[in-house]
Amino acid sequence: MKLHILAVGNKMPDWIKKGYTEYSQRMPKEAEMQLVEIKPEKRIGKKTEQLLQAESERIRIALPPGCHIVVLDESGKQATTVRLAELMTNWRESGRDVTFIIGGADGLHRDIKQIAHEKLALSTMTLPHGLARVLLAEQLYRAFSITRNHPYHRA
């Protein structure tokens, strides 16, 4: 199973890149994590709806075929790390890759939210989209470690 992360935004600060890389490199090949940065739309003279629509089209192009789509959204379902581990086991058993979608500064277009198989919330608080990458990568690693009885998770 591959874990794809499509994240709107590029030119992230080094601490974001390092944080994401720290956890993505810990993942074994059987649950490889791959980040694809989606270029954000330029704001000049455009309304939010236009920006989100343009980013939505880029996301659709980048979506791996046949994947299970999980949108990260503050209004999504709250899940504990143990629940995320259960979900990962289910996804792995389904034989499909999983794609997590993180919106940019303005969020995600409703069309992307509608094609999602699931909506999850990392927090009910609004998070900077760069930080969401790091938090997601850490939680995926932690959830995977639970499925393998690895001592990283000690709850």
Curated annotation (Swiss-Prot):
<dbReference type="InterPro" id="IPR003742">
    <property type="entry name" value="RlmH-like"/>
</dbReference>
<comment type="similarity">
    <text>Belongs to the RNA methyltransferase RlmH family.</text>
</comment>
<keyword id="KW-0963">Cytoplasm</keyword>
<keyword id="KW-0949">S-adenosyl-L-methionine</keyword>
<comment type="function">
    <text>Specifically methylates the pseudouridine at position 1915 (m3Psi1915) in 23S rRNA.</text>
</comment>
<feature type="binding site">
    <location>
        <position position="72"/>
    </location>
    <ligand>
        <name>S-adenosyl-L-methionine</name>
    </ligand>
</feature>
<keyword id="KW-0489">Methyltransferase</keyword>
<comment type="subunit">
    <text>Homodimer.</text>
</comment>
<feature type="binding site">
    <location>
        <begin position="122"/>
        <end position="127"/>
    </location>
    <ligand>
        <name>S-adenosyl-L-methionine</name>
    </ligand>
</feature>
<dbReference type="InterPro" id="IPR029026">
    <property type="entry name" value="tRNA_m1G_MTases_N"/>
</dbReference>
<protein>
    <recommendedName>
        <fullName>Ribosomal RNA large subunit methyltransferase H</fullName>
        <ecNumber>2.1.1.177</ecNumber>
    </recommendedName>
</protein>
<dbReference type="GO" id="GO:0070038">
    <property type="term" value="F:rRNA (pseudouridine-N3-)-methyltransferase activity"/>
</dbReference>
<dbReference type="InterPro" id="IPR029028">
    <property type="entry name" value="Alpha/beta_knot_MTases"/>
</dbReference>
<dbReference type="Pfam" id="PF02590">
    <property type="entry name" value="SPOUT_MTase"/>
</dbReference>
<feature type="binding site">
    <location>
        <position position="103"/>
    </location>
    <ligand>
        <name>S-adenosyl-L-methionine</name>
    </ligand>
</feature>
<keyword id="KW-0698">rRNA processing</keyword>
<keyword id="KW-0808">Transferase</keyword>
<dbReference type="GO" id="GO:0005737">
    <property type="term" value="C:cytoplasm"/>
</dbReference>
